[in-house]
Amino acid sequence: MGQCVTKCKNPSSTLGSKNGERESSKPHKRSSSHKEEHMSICGKASGEILVNGTKKGDASLEASQPLAVGVDTKKKEQGVGAELSSLQRIEELFRRYKDEREDAILEEGMERFCDDLCVDPTEFRVLVLAWKFQAATMCKFTRREFFEGCKSINADGIESICSQFPGLLNEAKQEDKFKDLYRFTFQFGLDSEEGQRSLHREIAIALWKLVFTQNKPLILDQWLEFLTENPSGIKGISRDTWNMFLNFTQVIGPDLSNYSEDEAWPSLFDTFVEWEMERRKSEEKTDCIPCLGTDHQSRDEQT
């Protein structure tokens, strides 16, 4: 979906009490005789007079139970009805975008889905939505992923999904949640049908840019430039390298002074640090050349 950085490849049961159970729980209806009415009034005053063999307080409790059961049952029925209605709306939404042949939302349907959500398929919000839906593949939502995803964010329509975006973006800022999103992104970028175990370098670069939308590390631009120039000739990014880069951004300072090759970093990081330090030295030399030229010119003018 939004993460389509390259061309994409292609019941609830009702609850309720039985009528017989409801009827059996109802108290016997008292007659309106003068004697019972008098006992009721007296019982209210003394608190000890029995009505049908029961203390007044107990009788009141008994009388209230059928109402409580009825209200509780009604609430359950309303809850079940609301759940069924929500599932129906999710079903209608899914059918609006699903493929004609496959029971899933594919590339074309995903584009229409994003259009209706007013989001660009390549933006961070779409990646976050795919994360909450636990989508296994780019540009595809299976029926199960779509239904479980909608239920997980309490949404059953375009408007309700849109209303969840601010909260989802805030959730993705939490350290533990972002770590989960970050690791999900690697798996999401793989072509599961081809059994890929590493990300193509170009795909990895695009996904790194995307996943760090809200909290960009200071070293990210240099890292991506290194991968773009690709001096080491790598073709893919392994899961270990992907996961360790997040640790790298958290513990290694932007000046790289606390990086040590003796620690258990992927060898690609060693190459990157060496490349970056050489690049910085080269830039320093380049910056000094104009300064020297200006200095000589000033001396000539003084002479």
Swiss-Prot record:
It is found in: Cell membrane; Cytoplasm; Nucleus; Cytoplasm, Perinuclear region. A lipid is attached at G2 (N-myristoyl glycine). Signal peptide: none annotated. Residues 85-277 form the DCUN1 domain. GO terms for biological process: negative regulation of protein neddylation; positive regulation of protein neddylation; protein neddylation; regulation of cell cycle process; regulation of protein neddylation. Keywords: Cell membrane, Cytoplasm, Lipoprotein, Membrane, Myristate, Nucleus. The keyword Protease does not apply. Transmembrane segments: none annotated. Gene3D superfamilies: Cullin, PONY binding domain, EF-hand. The keyword Cell membrane applies. GO terms for molecular function: cullin family protein binding; ubiquitin conjugating enzyme binding; ubiquitin-like protein binding. Contributes to the neddylation of all cullins by transferring NEDD8 from N-terminally acetylated NEDD8-conjugating E2s enzyme to different cullin C-terminal domain-RBX complexes. At the cell membrane, can promote and as well inhibit cullins neddylation. May interact (via the DCUN1 domain) with unneddylated cullins. This is DCN1-like protein 3. It comes from Xenopus laevis.
